[in-house]
């Protein structure tokens, strides 16, 4: 995505690849992970985007985001030491509002507090695919929104924004 190059952000498709585990008895890596899109700056993965082709449903709890998808995002965030991940779904008229970020979840913020690492965040977003020329700008908006986020502090097991 050329629109992010001036920010020093390097976009890669299904790269870098890492393994989630190591099988001790066979002495080999196991469970290859290939995130759909990674964005790096200064050689470090800053965010990961994973595309889903199922439709969200405004009438369902959590709009139908699968728990297994959150587990996958947690694995990516942990293995790539990345604090920002995105689940990206196609937008459709039944969702009502315009495309973009629909929900933000902190991934296991209590454990992160104990380790003194920043909380990991997953955003659920949609993209309007009706006009493919707008896709780069929609992605840019999601990325720039990440860059504008203040770090989340956890105090006594409660995210700081919940204290306001």
Regions found by a protein language model. Give the residues of each.
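Catalytic core segments in nucleotide and nucleic-acid processing enzymes
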Residues: 1-164
């Amino acid at each position: 995505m050329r629109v992010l190059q001036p920010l020093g952000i390097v976009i890669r498709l299904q790269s870098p690849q890492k393994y989630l585990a190591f099988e001790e008895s066979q002495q080999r890596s196991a469970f290859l992970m290939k995130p759909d899109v990674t964005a790096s700056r200064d050689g470090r993965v800053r965010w990961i985007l994973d595309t889903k082709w199922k439709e969200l449903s405004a009438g369902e709890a959590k709009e139908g985001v699968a728990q297994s998808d959150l587990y996958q995002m947690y694995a990516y965030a942990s293995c790539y030491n990345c604090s920002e991940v995105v689940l990206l779904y196609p937008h459709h008229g039944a969702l009502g509002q315009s495309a973009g970020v629909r929900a933000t979840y902190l991934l296991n913020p209590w454990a992160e507090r104990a380790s003194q690492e920043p909380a990991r965040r997953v955003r659920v977003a949609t993209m309007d695919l009706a006009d493919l020329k707008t896709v780069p700008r929609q992605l840019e908006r999601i990325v720039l929104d990440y860059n504008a986020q203040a770090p989340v502090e956890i105090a006594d097991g409660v995210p700081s924004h919940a204290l306001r």
